[in-house]
């Protein structure tokens, strides 16, 4: 059922996302489906369309061993892996668990930690692209490190990452402990605190970090390096 106040809040959130992404909200529609969905539930879908000049399309052809992988921190689970999240915390059977305050979360409720808005990286990344040779970008969504980082790698190159260098928030450690999830499955499902990675030449890594730090990503850091091989090596 269409509740104007609820619709207004949804559109407000979408509009804020558009501001962060520096794009326009150009349309939309609302349809009511009585009898098909519970009265207090709704389904939201959207998409963006981007255009890039051919000469500006990123190429990984010059990617080589020694290039540096930079991490842009996430704000949380970033809308991915929620089927596993619900299973781990038994949310469907006990929704009140969302109001619990595990010691690991520093005073936040579980619900607050899980529903932290997904960070939008458009503006800081565009600033880096203006001044640095970027050889690859990977958005760490569903599939975690193992499925997303390889998408930007040149054939014959691997991403070598020291697990000790990954700044993983307490929420992920809590999920792993409660759910008894293997380390591999955690890195193959969740972003583990890294929402996006950018690969740049080693000699431009400091400059790229300076740009990120000055444009809304003060906690961006060096995550790993490119080496010979395939896929992702977590060591």
Predicted regions span which residues?
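Glycine-rich anion-binding loops of enzyme active sites
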Residues: 1-83, 225
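Glycine-/charge-enriched secondary-structure boundary and capping motifs
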Residues: 6-21, 37-44, 92-98, 104-115, ...
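Acidic, glycine-rich loop-and-beta core segments that form the ion-binding/anion-interacting portion
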Residues: 63-112
């Amino acid at each position: 059922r269409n509740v104007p106040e609820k619709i207004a809040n949804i559109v407000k959130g979408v509009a804020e996302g558009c501001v962060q992404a520096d794009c326009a909200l150009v349309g939309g529609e609302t349809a009511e489906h009585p009898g098909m969905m519970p009265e207090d539930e709704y389904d939201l879908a959207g998409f963006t369309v981007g255009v890039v000049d051919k000469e500006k399309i990123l190429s990984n052809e010059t990617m080589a061993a020694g290039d540096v992988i930079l991490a842009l921190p996430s704000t949380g689970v970033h809308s991915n892996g929620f089927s596993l999240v619900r299973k781990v915390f038994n949310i469907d059977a006990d929704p009140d668990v969302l109001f619990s305050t595990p010691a690991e979360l520093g005073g936040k409720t579980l619900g607050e930690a899980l529903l932290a808005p997904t960070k939008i990286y458009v503006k800081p990344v565009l600033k880096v692209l203006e001044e640095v040779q970027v050889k690859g970008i990977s958005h760490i969504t569903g599939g975690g490190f193992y499925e997303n980082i390889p998408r930007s790698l040149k054939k014959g190159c691997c991403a070598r990452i020291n697990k000790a260098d990954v700044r993983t928030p307490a929420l992920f450690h809590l999920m792993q402990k409660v759910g008894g999830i293997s380390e591999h499955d955690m890195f193959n499902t969740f972003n583990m605190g890294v929402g996006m990675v950018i690969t740049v030449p080693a000699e431009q890594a400091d400059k790229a970090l300076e740009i990120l730090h000055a444009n809304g990503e003060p906690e961006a850091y060096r995550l790993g390096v490119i080496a010979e091989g395939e896929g992702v090596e977590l060591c």
